[in-house]
Amino acid sequence: MVKGFNVFIVLFIWRVLLGIGIGGDYPLTATIVSEYCSTANRGKLMAGVFAWQGFGNVLAPIVSIIVTACFMSKIDADVLYLDYVWRIIIGVGCIPGVATLYWRLTMADSVRFQNISANTRASSMESTRADEEKLLATETRNTNSISESNNEVAQSPLMESNRPGHTKTFSQHFSEWRHLKVLLGTSIAWFALDVAFYGINLNSAVVIDAIGFAGDLYQDKPSHFIIRNCVGNIIINILGSVPGYWITVFTIERLGRKTIQLMGFGVLAVLYVILGFAYNQILAKSTGAFIFLFSLAQLFQNFGPNVTTFVIPGEVFPTRFRSTAHGISAASGKLGAIVAQGGFLQLTNIGGHNAWIDHLLQVFALFMCIGFLATLWIPETKGKSLEEISEE
């Protein structure tokens, strides 16, 4: 028997590579848009770039429906044909990335970053000249003592790096509490959001199944069950996610980033408390009411912290640290996603099939409160230049 790779190992390897790419794209996108835009429309354009995720969230289940429909008769006869379906769907996801690769590779650094780099090089050259002059003066004064001169040469700053490394200057900057609390605020807020955001969105099929919208897996045809799940995702995204993104785009310059983030976390905490503690009662009375409240939560995720946790780290940090600090904030969010996925899978079925979903929603409410508190450490950036915000 010929043995091949375990499919989960292969997926894991490629997802790690995908994560490296996305891990670089998040801070790069936010930083470039932030540094290219004027103060008046910076937040709007940053939110607009991020809002295209909403269309991707709708397009993904549409592609899934189309591919499933193409294999419908074969899937219903043998579910192993789903192996073709999910591979094709993942392959289609490569197309947008490939389409934008050329422009991403040829995109120039912002003027702000180029100026910082030029100033750093000029400062380094001036430091070198000063060190050389100091060294020559030292040698002149100590011509009668070779050993003393050699000692001075060995200890001269010229022998060391003329410019502190990025890690050192980064550490020095964030060793001050007034700077560190901002980084902690953006990181903790993103972490708290993604626990709920990915806990729900990576498991939306579980939620759709729990409320009975997807039908019965054991009685319906497999293709019908999959398509109903996809339709459920489309409905939730169209009702909640997509409008939420674009409401933020058109209000972020008027309401402010911090205001939207605080409002979003606050409303989400209330909605998850309602959905969590009244879960069974709501479902018993009306599935439609649950879908409405669930979609409302999706709305305030995006007319709220899902957009602003991306925008704010692209504005609040100095140019020389902006992409690094944004990357740390985004990585904190993805750590929250890992916690959410692991916790959701482990806890969902405690006490029976989907029996613990109500308690998970209650846990998500707690994390929304944590995100709200972390946001208090973050300054408002509306109407301020990047230099004003970071005090450069």
Question: For each predicted feature, which ranges?
Answer:
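Transmembrane-helix signature of 12-pass secondary carriers
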Residues: 1-392
